[in-house]
């Protein structure tokens, strides 16, 4: 597993809920690939999760993946909260159903196929790759707004 792939991901929503989009900038060495899409009625958090899911789904073989996201929701969910949710039957600490559990379950399964680490980047702060992911997410949302 010597291939390291960087996934720069972002989600966007025009209204929350409303038309939304997701974007992924994939980088492997000097190679880059852009992915984006959207939905007519969604939330910003669903689009943030979908961006990571779509990036991971596009990988053809097991590899080391560094996911760079501006979403504390996604990063904290995968690094801290998901273990408790799974133990509690997909309920939060306050016994409420986990929001977006369909996407969390899909993301959890995809992460298990790779060696994944998570990096948080400040959004809208001039981080070039995050800005590109944001542009892609907005392109995805524009298809539905």
From Swiss-Prot:
Keyword set, alphabetical order: Cytoplasm, Endonuclease, Hydrolase, Magnesium, Metal-binding, Nuclease
PROSITE patterns, per database record: RNASE_H_1
Cofactor(s) listed: Mg(2+)
Family matches, as Pfam families: RNase_H
Nuclease in keyword set: yes
Domain of life: Bacteria
Ranges of residues in domain RNase H type-1: 1-142
Molecular function GO labels: magnesium ion binding; nucleic acid binding; RNA-DNA hybrid ribonuclease activity
Enzymatic reactions: Endonucleolytic cleavage to 5'-phosphomonoester
EC number: 3.1.26.4
SUPFAM superfamilies referenced in this protein's UniProt entry, alphabetically: Ribonuclease H-like (SSF53098)
Residues involved in Mg(2+) 2 binding: 10, 134
GO BP: any one term: DNA replication, removal of RNA primer
Predominant location: cytoplasm
Binding-site positions, Mg(2+) 1: 10, 48, 70
Keyword Magnesium: yes
Gene Ontology CC entries for this record: cytoplasm
Subcellular location: Cytoplasm
Cofactor details (free text): Binds 1 Mg(2+) ion per subunit. May bind a second metal ion at a regulatory site, or after substrate binding.
Subunit structure: Monomer.
PANTHER family: RIBONUCLEASE H1 (PTHR10642:SF26)
Family named by the database record: Belongs to the RNase H family.
Primary role: Endonuclease that specifically degrades the RNA of RNA-DNA hybrids.
Descriptive protein name: Ribonuclease HI
Organism name: Neisseria meningitidis serogroup B (strain ATCC BAA-335 / MC58)
């Amino acid at each position: 597993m010597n291939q390291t792939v960087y996934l720069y991901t972002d989600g966007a929503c025009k209204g929350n809920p409303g038309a939304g989009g997701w974007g992924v900038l994939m980088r492997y060495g000097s190679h880059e690939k852009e992915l984006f899409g959207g939905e007519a009625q969604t939330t910003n958090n669903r689009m943030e999760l979908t961006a990571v899911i779509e990036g991971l789904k596009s990988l053809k073989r097991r590899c080391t993946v560094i996911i760079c996201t501006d979403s504390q929701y996604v990063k904290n969910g995968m690094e801290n909260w998901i273990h408790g949710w799974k133990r509690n039957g997909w309920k939060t600490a306050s016994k409420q159903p986990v929001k977006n559990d369909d996407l969390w379950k899909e993301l959890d399964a995809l992460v298990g196929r790779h060696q994944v680490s998570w990096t948080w980047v400040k959004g809208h702060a001039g981080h070039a790759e995050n800005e590109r992911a944001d542009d892609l997410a907005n392109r995805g949302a524009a298809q539905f707004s």
